Amino acid sequence: MSSLPYRGRFAPSPTGPLHFGSLLAALGSWLLARHAGGEWHVRIEDIDPPRAEPGASERQLHTLAAFGLHSDGPVLYQSDRDAYYEAALSRLLRSGAAFECSCSRAELAAMGGIHHVCVAPLGIRRAVRLRVPPNTQASFQDALQGRITQDVYSEVGDVVLRRADGYWAYQLAVVVDDAAQGITDVVRGADLLDSTPRQLVLQQALGVAPPRYLHLPLILGADGRKLSKSHAAQPVDDSDPLPALRAAWRALGQAPAALPARASVAGVLQHAVQHFSPQRLPRVASLDAATRIDAPA
């Protein structure tokens, strides 16, 4: 794990406006970076055009600015980085660590959707997968969720790096960019906890050092499901950011009294940095609706 100066990031996908769960991840990652005296960077993960919403990235950046969360460097857009992903993929193909595959989801259904061996001949539509040998396990110590171990071979199988439709897979793009940006600490929602073992396997194949990981609890809506754009979660109000900012502070387990009753966004964040305690972060995978923006102070 990295011994370099702390460098964190927040990396939303432009599929809609930021909701309260997004704000929690942004604020949590920002506070941890500031607490460590490090940098915090913003990356727009716009590698899936069919899911992207026009103007969403601009609105997301506007919302972050309204909440006083500014990137410590230029915003990186994954849509500008095809050449870097192609270079990494070529290395893996040349070394035999990756291979082309035309197996469809329907064809893999009989194997539980897990790919170990190709069951279809190569066709025009070809994905590229990372070869995951038998007995491949990945284990890491999450700073909040504890020790996580996964048998990547039996539970995941060969990992898609480039989809059959030509779009880059999340796993490849995030590993390449975290390494290129020198990210030492990945702080994100617990919905991505399951992705981490396969990213560790890919990092090893590419010869890059893994960052440290901390997965914040998810915010669940009144229906018990994760707040998400796909479930029509309400966007945070960037015209009146203080209520949501205070609610996110509480959801991170921090003492409400640490923030001044009357202050600007900048003033609230200044006090937040001074009084933030990582030890108070909730050591759970999810939080119920009581911690949402409408929770009492």
Curated annotation (Swiss-Prot):
<keyword id="KW-0067">ATP-binding</keyword>
<keyword id="KW-0862">Zinc</keyword>
<protein>
    <recommendedName>
        <fullName>Glutamyl-Q tRNA(Asp) synthetase</fullName>
        <ecNumber>6.1.1.-</ecNumber>
    </recommendedName>
</protein>
<feature type="short sequence motif" description="'HIGH' region">
    <location>
        <begin position="12"/>
        <end position="22"/>
    </location>
</feature>
<dbReference type="InterPro" id="IPR000924">
    <property type="entry name" value="Glu/Gln-tRNA-synth"/>
</dbReference>
<feature type="binding site">
    <location>
        <position position="170"/>
    </location>
    <ligand>
        <name>L-glutamate</name>
    </ligand>
</feature>
<feature type="binding site">
    <location>
        <begin position="9"/>
        <end position="13"/>
    </location>
    <ligand>
        <name>L-glutamate</name>
    </ligand>
</feature>
<feature type="short sequence motif" description="'KMSKS' region">
    <location>
        <begin position="226"/>
        <end position="230"/>
    </location>
</feature>
<dbReference type="GO" id="GO:0008270">
    <property type="term" value="F:zinc ion binding"/>
</dbReference>
<keyword id="KW-0479">Metal-binding</keyword>
<dbReference type="InterPro" id="IPR022380">
    <property type="entry name" value="Glu-Q_tRNA(Asp)_Synthase"/>
</dbReference>
<feature type="binding site">
    <location>
        <position position="45"/>
    </location>
    <ligand>
        <name>L-glutamate</name>
    </ligand>
</feature>
<feature type="binding site">
    <location>
        <position position="118"/>
    </location>
    <ligand>
        <name>Zn(2+)</name>
    </ligand>
</feature>
<dbReference type="GO" id="GO:0006400">
    <property type="term" value="P:tRNA modification"/>
</dbReference>
<comment type="similarity">
    <text>Belongs to the class-I aminoacyl-tRNA synthetase family. GluQ subfamily.</text>
</comment>
<keyword id="KW-0436">Ligase</keyword>
<keyword id="KW-0547">Nucleotide-binding</keyword>
<dbReference type="GO" id="GO:0006424">
    <property type="term" value="P:glutamyl-tRNA aminoacylation"/>
</dbReference>
<dbReference type="GO" id="GO:0004818">
    <property type="term" value="F:glutamate-tRNA ligase activity"/>
</dbReference>
<dbReference type="Pfam" id="PF00749">
    <property type="entry name" value="tRNA-synt_1c"/>
</dbReference>
<dbReference type="GO" id="GO:0005524">
    <property type="term" value="F:ATP binding"/>
</dbReference>
<feature type="binding site">
    <location>
        <position position="188"/>
    </location>
    <ligand>
        <name>L-glutamate</name>
    </ligand>
</feature>
<comment type="function">
    <text>Catalyzes the tRNA-independent activation of glutamate in presence of ATP and the subsequent transfer of glutamate onto a tRNA(Asp). Glutamate is transferred on the 2-amino-5-(4,5-dihydroxy-2-cyclopenten-1-yl) moiety of the queuosine in the wobble position of the QUC anticodon.</text>
</comment>
<keyword id="KW-0030">Aminoacyl-tRNA synthetase</keyword>
<dbReference type="InterPro" id="IPR049940">
    <property type="entry name" value="GluQ/Sye"/>
</dbReference>
<dbReference type="InterPro" id="IPR014729">
    <property type="entry name" value="Rossmann-like_a/b/a_fold"/>
</dbReference>
<dbReference type="InterPro" id="IPR020058">
    <property type="entry name" value="Glu/Gln-tRNA-synth_Ib_cat-dom"/>
</dbReference>
<dbReference type="GO" id="GO:0005829">
    <property type="term" value="C:cytosol"/>
</dbReference>
<feature type="binding site">
    <location>
        <position position="101"/>
    </location>
    <ligand>
        <name>Zn(2+)</name>
    </ligand>
</feature>
<feature type="binding site">
    <location>
        <position position="229"/>
    </location>
    <ligand>
        <name>ATP</name>
    </ligand>
</feature>
<feature type="binding site">
    <location>
        <position position="103"/>
    </location>
    <ligand>
        <name>Zn(2+)</name>
    </ligand>
</feature>
